[in-house]
Amino acid sequence: MAEPLLVVGLGNPGENYARTRHNLGFMVADLLAARLGAKFKVHKRSGAEVVTGRLAQRSVVLAKPRCYMNESGRQVAPLAKFYSVPPADLIVIHDELDLDFGRIRLKFGGGEGGHNGLRSVAAALGTKDFQRVRIGIGRPPGRKDPATFVLENFSSPERPEVPTICEQAADATELLVEIGLEPAQNRVHAW
């Protein structure tokens, strides 16, 4: 039997961050858990919240680190080890400043683009070679600090679009699990 895939939604814990741009990964992970009909439980060895199940006929471990974004790797790496998931079978769902708001892109490896959550995961795993579901939040307006921008709630014009974007990102994640990176890229990047 094939080892599971590890699907991690990045975000920050706590109600203060729940509706911020930086928490899109958590929002999509919550949606995927709902599709599985399961509730997150704390994984004792890693401290992350996890759900196990099947997406697109594939065994998956869905996780949300319970630490702050810039420390995500300290919970993701132990999960990968516990479930014997190599980095290439890790999918990280995260917000992306370098994509227009609502745009979804799939990627394998590469740089972190200033994303501290990705940096932490790559450092803890010792490699950048893992899959990513990138969800565009766009660049901040004017000279606003990106670190401030990602921790703000979505703007009034953005807010109504967030549920649809999360649905599309969840669909993209399931497609990635089902058919693999290149075929999924061909379909998702045409949306």
Curated annotation (Swiss-Prot):
One of its GO terms (cellular component) is cytoplasm. It is found in: Cytoplasm. The record marks D95 as: Stabilizes the basic form of H active site to accept a proton. SUPFAM superfamilies: Peptidyl-tRNA hydrolase-like. CDD domains: PTH. One of its GO terms (biological process) is rescue of stalled ribosome. One of its GO terms (molecular function) is tRNA binding. Keywords: Cytoplasm, Hydrolase, RNA-binding, tRNA-binding. Pfam families: Pept_tRNA_hydro. Its main location: cytoplasm. Its EC number is 3.1.1.29. TRNA binds at Y17, Y68, N70, N116. It catalyses: an N-acyl-L-alpha-aminoacyl-tRNA + H2O = an N-acyl-L-amino acid + a tRNA + H(+). The record marks N12 as: Discriminates between blocked and unblocked aminoacyl-tRNA. The keyword Membrane does not apply. The active site is at H22. Hydrolyzes ribosome-free peptidyl-tRNAs (with 1 or more amino acids incorporated), which drop off the ribosome during protein synthesis, or as a result of ribosome stalling. Monomer. HAMAP family: Pept_tRNA_hydro_bact (MF_00083). Belongs to the PTH family. This is Peptidyl-tRNA hydrolase. It comes from Mycobacterium marinum (strain ATCC BAA-535 / M). The gene is pth.
